[in-house]
């Protein structure tokens, strides 16, 4: 039997674990899917723009903490760009787009539609946009526009530092050893610009690439 305090501790541990997992995987994805390609393209193209979709105003109910479990999920930006929230199935819409988020998400959606239309028509997202200027990507600061609830829309300057991320990961107590090794292994395979010859960490030597591949498939629900 676990007392209420014990249950709370267990939930907190699970929440911290999930948040850490999401943060590391998101940073790996941002590094490989945005920052690295932009750095390469910027050598011959100065008309580049980078964004991060961060909207996570889903409902938090007894059915689940959807801002945590779903958050700014891959593909969720499409209803905002198109202005068509019916792209999300009707049964899920009250959880993904609760009424209390309507004002903020419609503001964000209108802004995103302006940006995308302006890029297509003028090559500049800021044409006729009054607020929230979207600055060009510059390799010196590797800036991106955070697309979120109105009060959080801003230019951000915090590129992923591969070495620093792996250093933090090594001692992250919110993750089990095998989880840290798995994330480090995924990062090593994806950080092409930062390719290293050695395994991510010495203390991961007990896990082979085959072990980590099996763990990844299990984690991603492919086994």
Briefly describe each language-model feature range.
Residues 1-11:
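Single conserved hydrophobic/aromatic residue that forms the stacking wall/gate
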Residues 18-25:
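Surface-exposed cleft-lining segments at the edges of enzyme active sites
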Residues 32-223:
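Mobile gating loops/cap/lid regions near enzyme active sites that modulate substrate access
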Residues 25-33:
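Helical cap/lid subdomain of alpha/beta-hydrolase-fold lipid enzymes
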